[in-house]
Design a protein with these regions (language model features):
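N-terminal, polar/charged subdomain of small-to-medium soluble alpha/beta proteins
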Residues: 2-146
Length: 146
């Protein structure tokens, strides 16, 4: 046994997944917050037709909660949300059609994450690193919360 294991109090030892299943306990009542930072995609969104045709890079920051996340105990990927699948789904929404506003795009992404991944407290931020504004602006962002 390691020094760490020797110092763990007995009352911190948890029951395993199998023991909880035998007792009829379906979940571990543990929620987790998942954050995806700086997902960069080339898209065709914008107010003007020219902006949509030329396309531009958008950067997404996404956060959401997964209620009753059994993976906190089971360590099984199938007991949580696959982050890669979330990124692929966001990429599909962001590239399959054009939106005039970032507000609508962020809403579409947030709605999809809520529905497809059964997530709660979803926050989606889309950032235009080089907005077509004739003033010295580094970036613009829109954030939608669900």
């Amino acid at each position: 046994m390691s020094d760490f294991e020797d110092n763990v109090p007995d009352d911190l030892e948890g029951r395993g997944y199998e023991e909880r299943e035998e007792e009829g306990l379906d979940s571990f009542d543990s929620s987790v917050r998942i954050e995806i930072s700086r997902l960069s995609l080339f898209t065709h969104h914008g107010v003007t037709d020219a902006e949509q045709e030329a396309g531009q890079r958008l950067v997404f920051d996404i956060a959401f909660e997964v209620e009753d996340c059994d993976a906190t105990v089971t360590d099984r990927v199938e007991d949580t949300v696959d982050y890669g699948a979330v990124c692929q789904a966001v990429a599909l929404i962001a590239t399959e059609r054009s939106y005039r506003t970032l507000e609508r795009l962020c809403t579409a992404v947030a709605d999809m994450i809520e529905e497809r991944f059964r997530a709660a407290n979803v926050i989606v931020r889309a950032t235009k690193p080089e907005p077509p504004i004739p003033l010295p602006v580094e970036e613009v962002s829109v954030e939608v919360e669900r």
